[in-house]
């Protein structure tokens, strides 16, 4: 049995993951409007990943006989004036999500909820990867994105990124 505190935090996390998808849709749209289809694709894949994260949290709650409470998703309010703005905002957001996952994990630990801790282990690892990917995007943009050829090459590379469902999601079907 999960504690009310853990259930509430996991429900909150479902909504934060859905907000993440919504935020990355905004970034995808921004790059599409700038005719940078590769950068748009990179964020399109992020949308799919964040949606999968929400689905995993939802499934965990449902598998443990708890209802999922979906909240309204706020409109992203991040000024996007420079090509690097979504990249920087994306890293900051991933760092925020990492803090949220750690809060869920800490609550599960306090409650001696080892099953939830084991479930969240995947998210802890995933957030490390998400932060590294976001940081690498910024680094590569700073190195190569300030001239037309470099930006063109980065954009072409990011067009090839594809979504791969998390293995723990693939086993749910």
Question: Can you describe what each PLM-predicted range is?
Answer:
Residues 1-173:
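Iron-associated oxidoreductase/ferritin-like identity signal
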């Amino acid at each position: 049995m999960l504690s009310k505190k853990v259930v509430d935090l996991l429900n909150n996390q479902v909504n934060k993951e859905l907000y993440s998808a919504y935020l990355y849709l905004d970034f995808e749209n921004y790059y599409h409007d700038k005719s940078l289809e590769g950068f748009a694709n990179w964020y399109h894949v992020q949308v799919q990943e964040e949606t999968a994260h929400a689905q995993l949290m939802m499934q965990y709650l449902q598998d443990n006989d708890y209802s999922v409470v979906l909240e309204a998703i706020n409109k992203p309010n991040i000024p996007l004036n420079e090509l690097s703005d979504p990249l920087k905002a994306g890293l900051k957001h991933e760092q925020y999500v990492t803090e949220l996952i750690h809060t869920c994990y800490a609550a599960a630990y306090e409650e001696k909820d080892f099953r939830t801790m084991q479930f969240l282990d995947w998210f802890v690892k995933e957030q490390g990867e998400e932060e590294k990917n976001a940081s690498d995007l910024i680094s590569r943009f700073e190195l190569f994105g300030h001239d037309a050829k470099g930006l063109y090459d980065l954009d072409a590379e990011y067009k090839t990124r594809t979504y791969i469902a998390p293995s723990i999601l693939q086993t749910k079907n």
